[in-house]
Amino acid sequence: MEKVLMKTEGILRAEEVAPPEEYCEKVCLYSIRYQSDDCEVEGYVGFPLLHNGPWPGLIFNRGGNREFGFLRPEIICKYAQFGYAVFGSQYRGNQGGTGQEEFGGADVNDVIHLIDIALKVPCVRKEGIYMVGHSRGGMMTYRACAIDKRIRAAGIHAGLADAFIMYDRFHDGEYDMRQDMQDLIGGSPEEMPEEYARRSAVCWADKILVPLIICQGTNDWRVIPEQAYKMDKALSEAGKEHKLIIYEGADHSLKGTTYIADVLAWFDEHPL
């Protein structure tokens, strides 16, 4: 598969790496470097070993920003083990990549270009692709779902849907998200309201092109449940196909819930 990946237009480097031990017999994992605009971006690709191809492709969009919350092999393998060819990006400027991430600005192209690449890999089905985003990756997913019809269905894990709420509410004595958002977006909501609206899917839910499932925990203090409720309301008012699942007591990680099974069931309901 390394040679196959290297022959794929847009991939600059592909190296097989060892997956986490629990996935050694289930997933073949690769570290990749790919072209996105004028940037070279780092990422991972995972292929299932126990399922025959061609496989449906899945783009996983990581959370965090810069080196915080960087993409780890475990999440690629978690989805790949179920029969998906999973592609994930660190976004530009991170983990050795070039350029500068913009927290939902031009770096959304890193997701779109990864779709281009995934659909060119011979063992990946060509009819469309699935997408999943966690936290900040939810914002990236919403943005992609408003511009790319190749996405068949998407799942949002504790996803950022309102950048104004995120700016106002995600800060405590140890960590202040406001400075990160100012650094990456270029200013505060008061200084750059258009840029914050651009990163807030609640402001343009009518533009969403893709059936969505939104998974949210009630005890999430990073991306508070209000964001999911607002997005659910906005999608309903826009007449968009979607489903909201609330996990009582779950935090930002959604650990201990059925969120992965729920997302995969949603994909099964929307076959390629």
What are these regions (language model features)?
Residues 229-272:
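C-terminal catalytic histidine-bearing segment of alpha/beta-hydrolase fold enzymes
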Residues 8-51:
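N-terminal cap/lid segment of alpha/beta-hydrolase-fold proteins
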Residues 124-135:
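Alpha/beta-hydrolase fold nucleophile elbow
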Residues 208, 214-216, 220:
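Short beta-strand/loop motif that positions the catalytic acidic residue
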Residues 51-55, 60-99, 164:
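Short substrate-entry loop that stabilizes the transition state in hydrolases
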Residues 142-192:
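Hydrolase active-site cap/lid region
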Residues 219-223, 253:
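Acidic catalytic loop of the alpha/beta-hydrolase fold
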